[in-house]
A protein has these predicted regions:
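Transmembrane alpha-helices and adjacent helix-loop boundaries
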Residues: 1-313
Length: 313
């Protein structure tokens, strides 16, 4: 059976791919030209509408403060949602039925509710039950909604990552004397996070974008809300949307690039483990393990394990 998803394209497939690429490029160019013409017909390309973005006032008064609030809300939400999601993800696999039940109920409940509804409910709760100032209340409500929703989603991501690992990882950890908690924190969870890092990063990107919901509904002065204030002062609605959209794209691209770099670094560190242990260290794999576990097999390995340099016959 072939180990690749697709066979190498032949001459006809290559010609077809080239033709489709050319057609797609032409259609994309026509779409961009149509958008450009429509904007020009509506006078949205006039320099007077774009000129404010070349001045420091538009950035220091509107965009940069809004970007700062966006990053602050997203960073706080990430710092709380990541460990909280890991805790609930692990709790859903507990040996105790009541722990699994409580964790599963919490995760499914908050995952089913729209994040905007959670923000609105949190805002009303802070208005009626706390003394938080009106200036800080939108930030608290946005962070609360983002944490409750995204922690439940991250819990499922972590649980799926742990369940995707081979059972041999757990058995090997038990064989060397690790308890279940140590196995989870030292063996399974680090590997699960590495394996599910793309999904985790995608959820972090969602957190950054969902901060805009607080600006629309709660008056939170994040980037999109600051854009509306800028557009009201300079009467450049479409240009301001385009500039803010580019800022979001750059922000999420940087986050994704950092995650890709981190994933490669983690994988390289795993590959270099043997070099750190030393040249004389024998790397043991399941195929090279002699003896049996718990039956008093030959050799001096722990709990009846025998480690040999050669595979068993």
């Amino acid at each position: 059976m072939s180990s690749v998803l697709y066979d190498t394209p032949g001459p006809r497939a290559k010609r077809r791919n080239i033709l489709l690429s050319v057609v797609f490029t032409i259609l994309l160019a026509l779409l961009l030209w149509w958008v450009w013409q429509k904007m020009d017909d509506k006078n949205q390309l006039e320099w007077s509408l774009w000129e404010p973005f070349t001045t420091s006032a538009a950035w220091t008064t509107y965009l940069l403060p809004g970007l700062g609030d966006t990053l602050k809300a997203a960073a706080i939400s990430m710092l709380i949602a990541l460990p909280l999601g890991a805790v609930f993800g692990i709790a859903r696999m507990s040996d105790h039925a009541w722990v699994r039940g409580v964790a599963g109920t919490v995760v499914e409940f908050f995952r089913a509710i729209p994040v905007l509804l959670l923000m609105l409910f949190a805002n009303e709760f802070y208005v009626r039950s706390t003394d938080i100032s009106s200036e800080q209340r939108p930030l608290y409500a946005v962070v609360t909604g983002l944490v409750l929703y995204n922690a439940s989603v991250l819990a499922e991501i972590v649980r799926a990552g742990i369940l995707s690992l081979p059972r041999g990882q757990t058995e090997a950890a038990y064989a060397v004397g690790l308890r279940k908690g140590q196995t989870m924190t030292s063996v399974l969870l680090p590997q699960a996070v590495t394996a599910m890092l793309p999904a985790i990063v995608s959820q972090l990107v969602v957190i950054v974008k969902d901060t805009a919901l607080g600006g629309v509904m709660l008056g939170f002065t994040e980037l999109l809300n600051s854009r509306s204030t800028l557009a009201a002062n300079y009467a450049n609605v479409i240009p301001s949307f385009i500039v803010v959209g580019i800022i979001y794209i750059i922000l999420n691209f940087l986050l994704t690039s950092f995650a890709g770099w981190l994933e490669q670094r983690l994988r390289r560190s795993k590959k270099s483990t043997g070099a750190v242990l030393g040249e004389d260290t024998v790397e043991v794999n399941p195929a090279a393990v002699g003896g049996t576990f718990g039956t008093g097999g030959e050799g001096g390995g722990p709990s009846g394990f025998t480690f040999t340099d050669k595979p068993p016959r």
